[in-house]
């Protein structure tokens, strides 16, 4: 029996989605079983049909359910899934246990982790309308598609990346996949025998994916301009994974001179490549982002460009892409010729239509303005409610910033005190892969993309209470 709780912060459609997803994964809802009609489900739970429809669309986006014309939604038939990952290139990363988090999900009132989003901003109406039209009008999408992703979507992505990020590519060079982690697994196969330099601090999941697929990683500590070239040379690596437009998690932007040095490093020896993850590049509030490294190096330069739609749309819509230079593209097409693409063709075509009709560009513009206002409101509320010596870094771009509280008694104390007030965040040291000696001791990473505007004052007040409690305990 599904129970929804209107008093909770989580939207009703997300509660319904979570309940149904759990039943599907546990086997309580068997493959092939019809889900209740929207009107029936809405009447049973006392909610609107739009709420039910949004939850069902999310299940379809996750591959847990499918729609059948004039029949409704059904639990996905496990045996009928065509899209599989190459077994030799992707191994699930080990499940890490967060060091400073609250174990009970219900205790969290304000999620300041970097992976959360405000689901109310998702363009459910236009996305759902396109998807519904495709379900009825494009039955050929049930057939197996191009291994790199449907060509018309790749053309839309190539045009968008060229206009907004200066990426120099054709649709033929674009490979669509179910998340950057999956694409990194493919690259690990192509770069077998290599060693990768990765940013420290940095995105630990990247290191896990590469190492799980046989690519040893060497952490290189960043400076105020990003990854230092001298340290990169000393690492002995022939691959370099970087987030130059918005380093995760510090927010540092790699300046043009350092970018030129990095490209020179890659060009100096055959077999060197840069893996450019254009993380959070859509959300820059003060100035336009610098062009991508890939655009600076050219279509066949030593750069693989990666990006995802997880922040611009939603993490549950598993669509990412990479742009390969010609030599690597030919190897990819040869080595992965027997594998199907990992993204549902309905999802691919929904995104294609969403981009082609201008919805995506307008959505990004609205998101950028919305998040800019929330960033400014959150920063102002934090400054008003916390210590006058509070400093924020990295707020000019991306959807999180570094929050430094001098004299707080250490980041773990801050994380634990915040958790007691119902706030989830992480300490900066959690993003270090080794040698966190240079990590600022009183610094946490605060994401605001999951905060709704009306929750900002209360979230800042909760952190204020946590800060005052720590001040008293230190004294």
Model-derived features: where do they sit?
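Walker B catalytic acidic pair
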Residues: 277-278
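Structural preference for beta-strand elements that scaffold enzyme active sites
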Residues: 273, 304, 443-445
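Short glycine-rich anion-binding loops that position phosphate/pyrophosphate groups of nucleotides
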Residues: 117, 245-247, 311
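Conserved core of the PLP fold type I
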Residues: 131, 138-271, 282, 288-299, ...
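Active-site PLP attachment segment
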Residues: 70, 296-331
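N-terminal basic, amphipathic alpha-helical segments
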Residues: 1-132, 139-142, 327-328, 333, ...
